[in-house]
From Swiss-Prot:
One of its GO terms (cellular component) is mitochondrial inner membrane. The gene is NDUFB11. It comes from Cricetulus griseus (Chinese hamster). This is NADH dehydrogenase [ubiquinone] 1 beta subcomplex subunit 11, mitochondrial. It is a single-pass membrane protein. Complex I is composed of 45 different subunits. Interacts with BCAP31. The lineage of its organism: Eukaryota, Metazoa, Chordata, Craniata, Vertebrata.
Length: 151
């Protein structure tokens, strides 16, 4: 951990010296994790730009907020922009959220879990009323199972 922090500090120092044009010492520090040499600093030196950027005198983009302070990003025309925003919010919230949650609430029983619980409760009540055990060790009636004869 300490070697890594020392490596980062040494890199920053040598890069700062190279950027400012200070003469860098030919020191090579080696550790188990990092090696810093002047050659790595020279490769990272920024090149001078060959082309200078100039601002376009004729701006193609106009500030839509100057024309319409309530700009929503749907259209350049303020009236169309407001109507598109209202349509998106109506369908996005009213239709999708309200009708979507209603649809999800009234979906049929998934994998019949509710039906299985009701059927189990009905069977328990029937067995308790008739004095039968609630659960039997045999899932199937052994008298109805036909096994092959041993030879």
């Amino acid at each position: 951990m300490a070697a890594r922090l020392l490596s980062l500090c040494a890199r920053r120092l040598s890069v700062t010296a190279a950027v400012r044009g200070l003469p860098a010492a030919g020191v090579r520090w080696e550790s188990s994790r990092a090696v810093i040499s002047p050659s790595t600093v020279e490769r990272k030196r920024q090149r001078q730009p060959t082309m200078h950027w100039q601002e376009d005198p004729e701006s193609e983009d106009e500030n839509v907020y100057a024309k319409n302070p309530d700009f929503h990003g749907y259209d350049q025309d303020p009236v169309v922009d407001v109507w598109n925003m209202r349509v998106v919010f109506f369908f996005g919230f009213s239709i999708v959220l309200v009708l979507g949650t209603t649809f999800m609430a009234y979906l049929p029983d998934y994998r019949m879990q509710e039906w299985a619980r009701r059927e189990a409760e009905r069977l328990v009540k029937y067995r308790e009323a008739n004095g039968l055990p609630i659960m039997e060790s045999n899932c199937f009636d052994p008298s109805k199972i036909q096994l092959p004869e041993d030879e």
